[in-house]
Amino acid sequence: MSSPLDLYECVTAQGETVRSIKAKKGSKEEVDAAVQVLLQMKLDYKRVTGQDYKAGCPPQDGVTPQDGAAPQDGEDQVDPWSVSSSSAKGVDYEKLIVRFGSSKVDQELVDRISRLTGKTPHRFLRRGIFFSHRDMHQILDAFEQQKPFYLYTGRGPSSQAIHVGHLIPFIFTKWLQDVFDVPLVIQLTDDEKYLWKDLTLEECRRFTVENARDIIACGFDVNKTFIFSDLEYMGASPAFYRNVVKVQKHVTFNQVKGIFGFTDSDCIGKISFPAIQAAPSFSNSFPQIFGDRKDVQCLIPCAIDQDPYFRMTRDVAPRIGYLKPALLHSTFFPALQGAQTKMSASDANSTIFLTDTPKQIKNKVNKHAFSGGKDTIEEHRKLGGDPDVDVSFMYLTFFLEDDEQLEKIRQDYSSGAMLTGELKKSLIDTLQPIIAEHQEKRKHVTDDIVQQFMTPRKLHFSC
């Protein structure tokens, strides 16, 4: 394995290569290929050092890996801190289901959700974006028997602006809340970001409030939704902290090292944090909502990179007298430069932020969205494009509601009838109004509204 310093120097050199190609006005394909190599190098650097690459800041001596054992040769890297794939199509989710031991969201499950709710399945279910689950049938059994359950999802507030990829779990959770008419708790893990990132507590608090505004702008029902900051709620809720301590007592250091790859040089806050992310899975962590009830099951919609936290939670739950939480896992929202990694707020060029203007959205898509098209118009007309690696088409699968229109775009692009520029225009025309609408809704989220959502209180739900 290369040393951290060797990797740092390789990333630096590749960055110079990218800049040189751009300065010489190299072809788009040449630039994209060089950028892909750079992104992969940065991922390798982070996997080995546990740090994001920063120009002019070589790694310190003694840096050790923080994300556990590397995947087997040819396997995708998927954990709570990094996601990468060597395939232009992105992560192989069928293999990931086998590797993680979860169950596929099949048509039978989608049909059952539709039948019980009386609603058309969300496009994320229809298109396999939420592709994996744990015990979702138990949640549907409870719903069928008119027993209550609740939703739990979260966000790590590491920056003031969130990007379109962050919207995915909240869009789907909002739909679940609406069709099942159930309460929802949203954990903002500001403590986690303080422990993992170079941030002050004050910055974490500010990011928490700003991220809460974006979440509220998704349209959640204030009467059924409680948003909480770990740094605030932990000190205000003895019941929540008791559950944290129960989990801490029943999970060994050796277990969390095996699950999360912690090392002897990690601060003790990191080692104990998984118990804090586990605690919202238990209904009596929220006595203001559920009283002391332990029998209200939890459903967690999340990206599959969060699954290690909840595998641990599901393992410990029966040993401390609680129900195992159920999960629905989503695929990753790819970076603009390609599906080999997920969108990240740390790279402005790979990211479309919810604060971007229509012009910025257009420029980012046109300049940076990886294309599955051919090198020339003539070749593209003859051979067609590849929607399976084309980022613009991937984004449309997330945001374009009309299934027939999406399929027509797929066919036209694959046949060569639609050019890359036309496909990108379809994406731009889809994204711009969605982000503009979100920005308008966010303007109306006042400090008082944020306070309402973040105040511990009774929520309305059917027992």
From Swiss-Prot:
GO terms for cellular component: cytoplasm. The keyword Protein biosynthesis applies. Disulfide bonds: none annotated. The keyword Kinase does not apply. InterPro entries: aa-tRNA-synth_I_CS, aa-tRNA-synth_Ic, Rossmann-like_a/b/a_fold, Trp-tRNA-ligase, uS15_NS1_RNA-bd_sf, WHEP-TRS_dom. Residues 3-59 form the WHEP-TRS domain. Residues 54-86 are annotated as: Disordered. GO terms for molecular function: ATP binding; tryptophan-tRNA ligase activity. A motif ('KMSKS' region) lies at residues 342-346. SUPFAM superfamilies: Nucleotidylyl transferase, S15/NS1 RNA-binding domain. It comes from the Eukaryota. It holds the Pfam family tRNA-synt_1b. Its EC number is 6.1.1.2. A motif ('HIGH' region) lies at residues 157-166. It catalyses: tRNA(Trp) + L-tryptophan + ATP = L-tryptophyl-tRNA(Trp) + AMP + diphosphate + H(+). One of its GO terms (biological process) is tryptophanyl-tRNA aminoacylation. Keywords: Aminoacyl-tRNA synthetase, ATP-binding, Ligase, Nucleotide-binding, Phosphoprotein, Protein biosynthesis. Disruption phenotype: Knockout embryos show morphological phenotypes such as small eyes, small head, and pericardial edema. Belongs to the class-I aminoacyl-tRNA synthetase family. Catalyzes the attachment of tryptophan to tRNA(Trp) in a two-step reaction: tryptophan is first activated by ATP to form Trp-AMP and then transferred to the acceptor end of the tRNA(Trp). Could also possess an angiostatic activity. This is Tryptophan--tRNA ligase, cytoplasmic. It comes from Danio rerio (Zebrafish). The lineage of its organism: Eukaryota, Metazoa, Chordata, Craniata, Vertebrata.
